[in-house]
Amino acid sequence: VTISGLGGEPDYDQRFKMWAEDIDSSLKRAGGDANVITLTAPTREQIRARFAEVSRQAKPDDALVLMLIGHGTYDGTEYKYNIPGPDMTGTELAALLDRIPATRQLVVNMSSSSGGSIPSLQKKNRIVITATKTGTEKNATVFARYWAEALRDPAADTDKNDSVSALEAFHFAQRKTTEFFDSAKRLATEHPVIEDTGKGEGERTPSTENGEGKLASAFTVVRLGANA
């Protein structure tokens, strides 16, 4: 499920929609038995209705991927994802995810302030990737652009097994995000992190030492080439 939220102005609306469509086409091109759903600027009711549908169809041995593109806010306590009408809180998103029987879940929150959603979203067997380390990194993000790229660029497949794992996509998009700020000679306003232990804070450098990344390394997001 890919959602592009409210841009607030035409430039962002277009950008968010374009990134979501890029992801959508990569997933559909990969084929397989994936059920690809893409929502553009949906309301809370539309998101809930789609999740109810997924909940009815999903089985425990399925894998669920939720990708959020757009703007988010964080008031020091609660993260909110910006959509038309009332925004959706991290707690509400977590409740929707909890109702889906798929045991393995990946949430990629690519909005501004997305780091603030980690405490609400983290759970055993759920990988959480966010564009920002904390809720206070509130500038518009570029991570989604490079996450979309990771799902179609063979360079992201570092172990050359014709598929891109959540960890490989994270590393690729993280590196490209850093390069974006470096080449523009700008101070980085987003620091992507990953959390897949169900506890603790997001890590910028997942390793065996901090225990992060193990689940993500075994989670295939997309298959490339002949094996698709």
Describe each PLM feature range:
Residues 1-228:
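Cysteine endopeptidase catalytic domains of the caspase/legumain-like
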